[in-house]
Amino acid sequence: MTSAESARRHPRTGPPGPHWTPATVRPVSEPSRHGPRYGTVDTDYALRMAATPPEEDGPVWMVNLMKYREIADYGDDGESTISGRDADDLYAPFEVLADIGAEVVFFGDVEAQLLGDSPTWDRIGVVKYPTRRSFVEMNSRPDFQKKHVHKDAGMQETIVIGCLPVDLPVFETQNWAEVPHPPTDDDGPITVVHVLRFSGDSTADMDAYSLVAGEVAIPHGVRIHGWFAAEGTIIGDGRTWDQVRFNAFPSRAAFHAVATDPYRLAAQADHREPALADTYAMIVAPGLDALATSL
């Protein structure tokens, strides 16, 4: 990734926000007056989303980290015998998303969590909304709220990060049929998702690491499907984040070869670890990956 220094935290587009007054904001669908059970709404970010004129609004990518209940909990509405994952499948508001011009651009189950102790995430999803206003308005629609009952029942915990694309490093894309560990029926493509919070102004260290990681990973077929700057966390556990990165590998064997490379490991110790205050890293089996074409 020979121009990693261009991949800063700065987004490519302008500031967020629909032309709403703060008094009209309803940042996240509320199953009750106490708000959703699976996380805490960041009202400051919601207000920022609501404070910018329409001409300064634009697309936002909402990155969802999902942890399910073992058994869905519908509260007073009745005893449940389905899993939290199944309840989330019932939620899936595809019709609502299509109606407002939003689309799911990434979706997959977490196979392994490499970094970050708790929670252990189950799924990752990304929805691209045409504007921040469309995201806010969606949450007050009756048809969305009806479906949201299933999300509240199935979700134990979630983090939803509003993101904008950053400029990507430029490098030659390898033909996956010609790399040392090509995809096979038994070992197909994976996406490694990194959720990053930097330690102070430490992008220089992260850039230095990315240069080395790129030198190692490019011959093994890595493809950057999207790097994003976090503009806010609309719902979560109170932590803030700086970036989310989606790197695709042709196979698990290819990722393993990169992860265990001594040159990359030395750069990780010298640069990546000092650069980060908090992180998750997950191997995801993508069921849908249209991130690159959504940028």
Segments and roles (model prediction):
Residues 2-123, 130-137, 154-266, 274-295:
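Short S/T/G/P-rich N-terminal loop/turn motif that feeds into the first structured element of a domain
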Residues 129, 138-145:
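Short, amphipathic alpha-helical segments
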Residues 140, 150-153:
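Short, surface-exposed basic-aromatic patches at helix termini and helix-loop junctions that form
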Residues 143-149, 263-269:
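A common structural junction motif
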